[in-house]
Amino acid sequence: MESRDIILRPVVTEASMALIDNKRYTFDVDPRATKTQVKKAIEEIFEVTVIKINIMNVKGKLKRQGRYAGYTKKRRKAIVQLSADSKEIQLFGEE
């Protein structure tokens, strides 16, 4: 799997934005990716040093459209802790 295929998108929520102050970044990753693959991809794409990764599987939510019910897509979320001497990751382009 290519590095760009592993990291799908950053997660932009109030909670994940609060973690950025502690150099912790949250990303949606490929459901088949392991911690080792995620670490390698983050270090390769953003040129930073990763010291810790927490990964969680998020279940799909039940959604209804009239009498028809279905589930949203399940996803895998990774919270990445960078080392103190690593540069910050620019999620929204140049500021």
Curated annotation (Swiss-Prot):
Q: Name one Pfam family in it.
A: Ribosomal_L23
- What Gene Ontology molecular function terms does this protein carry? rRNA binding; structural constituent of ribosome
Per the record, the GO terms for biological process are: translation
Coiled coil: which residue ranges?
none
Q: Summarize the protein's role.
A: One of the early assembly proteins it binds 23S rRNA. One of the proteins that surrounds the polypeptide exit tunnel on the outside of the ribosome. Forms the main docking site for trigger factor binding to the ribosome.
Quaternary organization: Part of the 50S ribosomal subunit. Contacts protein L29, and trigger factor when it is bound to the ribosome.
Keywords, A to Z, come to:
Ribonucleoprotein, Ribosomal protein, RNA-binding, rRNA-binding
The species this protein belongs to is Pediococcus pentosaceus (strain ATCC 25745 / CCUG 21536 / LMG 10740 / 183-1w)
Family statement drawn from the similarity comment of this UniProt entry? Belongs to the universal ribosomal protein uL23 family.
Q: What's this protein's name?
A: Large ribosomal subunit protein uL23
Q: Which GO terms describe its cellular component?
A: ribonucleoprotein complex; ribosome
Q: Which SUPFAM superfamilies match?
A: Ribosomal proteins S24e, L23 and L15e
Spell out the HAMAP family in the cross-references: Ribosomal_uL23_B
